[in-house]
């Protein structure tokens, strides 16, 4: 994991343990989406951390109404300089 539970909780401003399980799932989802968007293995860089934290925050805030198309477009934009070209 390139983002720890504590980093994610600090980013989300969550101080209580009640949400730990769901935040861990969001971190895993964020890393998976980041790898899929990058089209290469995940490395521990600042831009990749930002991307994972963006996904975590988006999913945390939009649990009931997450628009995965919007999320994916934003993630592509964030990672555009790192993304492998595909033909």
Spans of features found by a protein language model:
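Divalent metal-cofactor coordination and adjacent catalytic microenvironments
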Residues: 1-87
């Amino acid at each position: 994991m390139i983002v720890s539970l504590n980093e994610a909780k600090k980013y989300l401003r969550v101080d209580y343990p009640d949400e730990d399980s769901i935040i861990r799932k969001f971190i895993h989802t964020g890393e998976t989406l980041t790898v899929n968007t990058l089209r290469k293995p995940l490395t521990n860089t600042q831009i990749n951390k930002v991307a994972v934290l963006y996904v975590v925050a988006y999913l945390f805030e939009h649990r009931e109404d997450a628009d995965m198309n919007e999320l994916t477009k934003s993630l592509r934009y964030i990672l555009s300089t790192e993304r492998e070209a595909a033909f």
